[in-house]
Amino acid sequence: MDGWERAFVLHGRPYSETSLMLDMFTEGHGRVRLLAKGARSRRSNLKGCLQPFTPLLVRWGGRGEVKTLRSAEAVSLGLPLSGMMLYSGLYVNELLSRVLEQEANYSVLFFDYLQCLQALAAEDVSPEQALRQFELALLNHLGYGLDFLHCAGSGLPVDDGMTYRYREEKGFIASLVVDHYSFTGRELRALAERQFPDVQTLRAAKRFTRMALKPYLGGKPLKSRELFRQFVRKQPDPPVDDA
């Protein structure tokens, strides 16, 4: 690749004695795997910038699944995530590493990701709000298009006071059954608008995104969720829910 491209490090691990294997999310090529040769050596000027949550400009080259990082520059300082916000960011990074195909264009999702990180860093909204909004954006970009505002059975607009049961690949159908797969019309409107004004709608959003993302994760648990739980256990006033 000849030009520079905006990117973030999703995950990095040591490779050989002095190199790094990087999973990166780029604006134009989606998720790419890059080998940063010599990045761990004492003389490398890449050490400080190849960190999660640092906006980068990168260039790479080569063939095959793993490309070679040619250059990388930090556009600005890393976004200041700490505490719950840091673990929320790690969750988002792991989610992208797990569900995105390599070298597929997710240019709009890149901006959703940036917006999520900026919201977490600024603490403009609760981490739960930011995560649910991003998960719904991610599902939309993965082609998981659902109509939250109409009953899949009748085609009628959802009623705030009625209950609808989620059926995979079909949508939401009016039902008298109230269980894990059931949502009120009010909760469905919140999902459609990606705005969650209270604990009830936030929990409903979490329930739905967990169900919808499960097939993409292949039954393998996310490590970041366990790290978050360990962090929460140490807090004097733990939050209502985990990531």
From Swiss-Prot:
Q: Name one Pfam family in it.
A: RecO_N
Gene designation: recO
What SUPFAM superfamilies does the record point to? ArfGap/RecO-like zinc finger, Nucleic acid-binding proteins
User: Source species, please?
Assistant: Serratia proteamaculans (strain 568)
The identity of this protein, by name, is DNA repair protein RecO
- Family (UniProt): Belongs to the RecO family.
GO CC annotation, single? bacterial nucleoid
Record keywords: DNA damage, DNA recombination, DNA repair
The UniProt entry, under InterPro entries, shows: ARFGAP/RecO, DNA_rep/recomb_RecO_N, NA-bd_OB-fold, RecO, RecO_C
Give GO BP annotations, semicolon-separated: DNA recombination; double-strand break repair
The keyword Nucleotidyltransferase appears for this protein = no
This chain's function reads: Involved in DNA repair and RecF pathway recombination.
